[in-house]
Regions:
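Extracytoplasmic/periplasmic sensory segments of membrane signal-transduction proteins
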Residues: 37-47, 52-140
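Generic structural "secondary-structure junction" signal
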Residues: 6, 72-75, 168
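Structured catalytic/translocation cores of nucleotide/phosphate-coupled proteins
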Residues: 19-24, 31, 35-36, 105, ...
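Glycine-centered, small-residue-biased loops immediately flanking beta-strands
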Residues: 199
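Extreme N-terminal signal-anchor transmembrane helix of membrane signaling/transducer proteins, especially
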Residues: 1-29, 33
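Extracytoplasmic/periplasmic ligand-binding sensor regions of membrane-associated signaling proteins
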Residues: 94-97, 106-192
Length: 200
């Protein structure tokens, strides 16, 4: 009788162990699938946001590069920069993610919304990669890698830029416009999505 009770007790233990193991495997698989699904959704959301955000910025840059006042200033050395600067300042004020705007003309004139950038020489800017890439892409908007920019409001700030060549009616180069976006704006949104915090 004691052996029978012992066998029965062992059988119950094995049964509980088997059920527990199956439950653990099932639960673990479900949790893993849920986590992977959440991570994929976060990646998709991030990708869609960045794509639509950059599309909007590229459209803004295109509008600026084709603006009549910008073209006229770039063509005419005697033209007043006030109209162009007012236009660029308005763009900066209406989009909190934009930190500065710059126009460098082919003949070496510089208009910028930030006074610290205004103190730089246009010849130095013409030698920088963002200027050269804009020329190379023939009036198409170009996204530049993140870099540090010295601004009046901050000692240094990480920015991502959209640049575009300014051309006349015949497609001849007149200069390059650049819009600087605070990198922390993109980073803050991606952090808000909590990508990776629930992933593997």
């Amino acid at each position: 009788l004691i052996q029978l009770v012992l066998y029965f007790f062992l059988f119950i233990l094995l049964l509980f162990g088997l059920i527990g193991s199956l439950y653990y495997q099932t639960s673990s698989g479900t949790i893993r699938q849920q986590t992977e699904r959440t991570t994929r959704n976060s990646i998709d959301q991030s990708s869609q946001f960045i794509t639509s955000y950059l599309k909007k910025l590229k459209q803004t840059t295109t509008v600026l590069s084709k603006d009549q006042a910008v073209r006229q200033f770039a063509q005419d050395r005697s033209a007043d920069q006030e109209t162009v600067q007012h236009l660029m300042r308005t763009m900066i004020e209406t989009d909190p993610d934009l930190v500065s705007a710059v126009l460098v003309t082919k003949d070496g004139r510089l208009v910028a919304t930030d006074t610290k950038i205004s103190m730089q020489t246009s010849s130095d800017m013409m030698n920088e990669s963002w200027y050269q890439e804009a020329i190379k892409e023939r009036a198409m908007p170009v996204l530049t890698p993140a870099r540090k920019e010295s601004l009046t409001s901050e000692k240094e700030k990480w920015v991502v830029s959209i640049t575009q060549e300014v051309v006349d009616q015949t497609g001849q180069n007149l200069g390059v416009v650049r819009l600087d976006i605070g990198y922390d704006s993109l980073q803050a949104y991606l952090d808000h999505l909590q990508l990776g915090k629930q992933g593997f």
